[in-house]
């Protein structure tokens, strides 16, 4: 009698949620009355903040700097669209907060990062959801996420072998490489070699 | 959490060599795996061993230390072979129940390191009980082994399926020539004096909660108000126990030396020793690169705790001293995964610590030899942790077999690689010096076999031997 | 309400699965492989997925239990540029798949393609509240090109180590200037 265990990949989540290095997570949580008012306000505020930061060219906020997240979104589902019979009209007793994200690394590490680094952020977004335990201790919080997580049926990444840090490094590297190519036009071999060494030193964090 | 809040450690109930190492005087070890044909016979044999099992109890006089120590661990198939019922078995962790061979993909044990290529007896479910004997001399080890074998002969349905002897090398180094076995975790109530072994906080180090290593105690996640204990098998089996990882890792010393030699030709005028230090993050005598980037400290004392109290972010954020992908920086990042402006910079690393108690095996390759002599040599890697998946597997999958956490893409640990190949390794240069690259190449280390085991506390062992499960 | 982050867009549609067709739909999704994902036909797509929502999960602390009357197919996508032209592409390129998936949903137009399908998806759209992207200005093509350049640069940096200047320069030119269309 072998132990029957769910197929767990190195990422700690079901294989269907994984494409190469990319991991996806989707969570629905039921939202209290207070959330109906709070969440739209929150979304408006953080969206505005993000736009202001972009306009001011200030470094992006903590969430965007968590270097293993490609994309993340929160959505409040208040009603399910109706398409006529034979669909039955849904009446939601509670709106549902939908969270979706694509990231790298392990599922556990991802949730840990939210617990430790985005602690206040967690409470802002999930504080009005039923059953939301505190971000720490992490064990009940991970349990909560697991219970409310939806497994993907088909998940696609356009660049599955790349992690977010690789994408950011590649982008930074490309810019600097273009500048380098401009600098070495018509250079002698010795000047080229020196410039190459200087370039490698400049981009070593991207390699 | 302060030491005063913590439950006192029941040292007599915890097996030895976990919280406190037996020490380098015990320089000979044998790892003996047995197979149990019959539950009753197996339990009886286990019962016969109980009085010899060495605990973590304080010895009143260190000079009265025993000639040898004996410890017992059990695989999942071993628990089944002992007759542990299904509802009790469910309390053990998923990865332990699956076994190390089933986790091969995750661990990077593919190609030549894949379980189908492992040595007979390991990874097939045949290995049930691991008896580890440490002794002060080889004669004492022989004597203890003979006694064990006699007991196995006399017992009903017990056979030895695997035996690996091991012994410390000179200066407690491992086969690639690096000082090993030190810089272990600092644990509250046990070893807080190990500066640098705990969690880096603002200006100080905090010991890790005991429950990160021993079941039945609060771990780092046991926060107020609930202060819940981490999940563990139910009493009496769970308390004072821990999970153990056993991996026989064969090392190709000749290949490693040859690779370093060839690569060093282009590195800083052939400084092979420095290149060797860059791969690991410590000079061969144990001096950390972060503390002393240009030369090892002569007579470096690895037992001096203050030598281990270094961090990365304050002086070496870019890896100019200790490369970002160096072995020790990967295996224990300390504050290196820290977050800008965050006080508790060790928070993304602190729940992945392990206690290492492995031993080298096989004869040393003569110094300066760069051709393999065909001898089997390497490291019996042994570690202890409360959660194999979070701790050992977490380190192996996220930090050793991948580089993303360190912004190194898919670069793996250059020393361990994986079964087929290492990737490149970038050795960061101090501006204006450019980085130096170690080219991808065949792996120096191969997995020859392994098991996940449970190390019961002493009362738990008695209960198992008596068939008393609840 | 924010469906955009930089030039990237988030889209979500929830469509009710025709009663009795859930197993077929699920089987079809199970049969899709990531290596030959239909989404590869939409090169503006960074990440996308289909998820089946069987029912809500209820928390113990909820006063009432909530149950869905149908099963739903959820489609989410993170892609480049504006929604309207993306849906045009989807309704054109993904016609066969659309039939197998949305074709099994209530209210889907016959043929599951073109303008009618686009209207159907827009009708079932759920607007995103807050959308964050790590690289909001990079399109899929930008990402892939940069990743490729990085891989080639790394290979070159490793293999050219120790070359004398003249050899280094000519090797560099051969790798990056003659074969690389864009200087």
Where are these regions (language model features)?
Chain A
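Short S/T/G/P-rich N-terminal loop/turn motif that feeds into the first structured element of a domain
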Residues: 1-73, 78-81, 90-96, 102-109, ...
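An amphipathic, aromatic/His-enriched active-site/gating alpha helix that lines ligand/cofactor pockets
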Residues: 104-139
